[in-house]
């Protein structure tokens, strides 16, 4: 196993997780459950391919993907914040909605039920001279940027306040609903970028191409105890397990079924180790009147 090849592949695999987990931290620190990351990523991936296909520019695809993630985030925000719907139920519904919507428009735009035509991407390989894909840099910087916002800015203080003590925050003039709307919007944009990277790295959209990555990202948020840097480290750990799975696939001495379950087994073990010890934001998932 080539260490350089392992590292470069691990980084590429980790980028969608890093984007989505960073967005998940922002939303959950404000008190909104982020089971919707899978749907945000899927919406971002599809919108990125549509934007790139019709414009010929991957940068337009990036903007389109951000809008795609934001679209589903706004549905999530309106239903859970304004109408006070159950956040877990809405999270499941958003993910199913994203699958249905992308499948419908895949057929409408590209006359296919499985995949889009190939589109222009950024390249995505790590060369000796550095990274040739700007989204790699953005993905690696996502967690430090979120950490700075959460812990070093007035907005971050408000996010933490409404996630822990919304009544106290409201009593000193902080609009809990406004802060949560913004936090969920940021979550949608960042998770959408995770989908953008995934789609443009593969140069096409395929049906349900996120394949559970949003759920692994939210697992990283929990494993990282709602800290963006720790969540990023968890993303790298899960990406390393996925890379190991890929590079061991040609090893006939190990049963293929065991190799395929390595990343998911690691997620289960990691979460089992923090259950009961990880303390979420006090107001996470609670309906605000």
Task: Identify the residue ranges that each predicted region occupies.
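Hydrophobic core segments of alpha-helical transmembrane domains in multi-pass membrane transport
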Residues: 20-21, 45-49, 99-103, 138-148, ...
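Cytosolic-side transmembrane-helix boundaries in multi-pass membrane proteins
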Residues: 145, 154, 164-178, 248-289
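Hydrophobic alpha-helical transmembrane segments
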Residues: 7-10, 14, 39, 43, ...
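Alpha-helical transmembrane segments within multi-pass membrane transporters and channels
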Residues: 56-101, 141-144, 242
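Membrane-interfacial amphipathic/re-entrant helices at transmembrane-helix boundaries
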Residues: 1-20, 33, 47, 55-60
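Transmembrane alpha-helical segments in multi-pass inner-membrane proteins
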Residues: 205-264
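Helix-loop-helix "hairpin" substructures at the membrane interface of multi-pass membrane proteins
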Residues: 57, 130-205, 228-233
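Transmembrane helix-bundle core of multi-pass membrane transporters
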Residues: 87, 98-153, 203, 207, ...
């Amino acid at each position: 196993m080539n260490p350089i090849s392992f590292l470069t592949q691990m980084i590429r695999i980790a980028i969608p997780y890093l984007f989505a987990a960073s967005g998940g931290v922002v939303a959950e620190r404000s008190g909104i459950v982020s089971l919707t990351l899978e749907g945000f990523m899927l919406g971002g991936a599809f919108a990125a391919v549509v934007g790139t296909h019709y414009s010929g520019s991957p940068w337009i695809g990036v903007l389109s993907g951000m809008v795609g993630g934001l679209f589903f985030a706004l549905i999530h925000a309106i239903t859970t914040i304004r109408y006070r719907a159950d956040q877990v139920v809405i999270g499941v519904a958003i993910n199913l909605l994203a699958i249905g919507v992308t499948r419908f428009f895949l057929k409408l735009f590209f006359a296919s039920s499985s995949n889009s035509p190939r589109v222009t991407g950024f390249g995505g390989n790590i060369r000796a001279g550095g990274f040739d894909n700007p989204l790699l840099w953005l993905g690696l910087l996502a967690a430090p940027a979120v950490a700075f916002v959460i812990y070093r800015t007035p907005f971050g203080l408000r996010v933490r306040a409404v996630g822990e003590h919304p009544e106290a925050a409201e009593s000193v003039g902080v609009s809990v609903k406004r802060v949560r709307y913004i936090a969920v919007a940021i979550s949608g944009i960042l998770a959408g970028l995770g989908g953008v990277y995934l789609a443009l790295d593969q140069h096409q959209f395929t049906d349900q191409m996120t394949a559970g990555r949003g759920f692994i990202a939210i697992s990283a948020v929990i494993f990282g105890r709602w800290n963006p840097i720790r969540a990023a480290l968890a993303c790298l750990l899960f990406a390393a397990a996925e890379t190991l799975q890929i590079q061991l696939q040609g090893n006939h001495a190990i049963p293929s079924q065991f190799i395929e379950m390595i990343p998911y087994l690691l997620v289960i073990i990691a979460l089992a180790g923090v259950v009961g010890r990880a303390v979420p934001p006090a107001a996470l998932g609670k309906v605000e009147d």
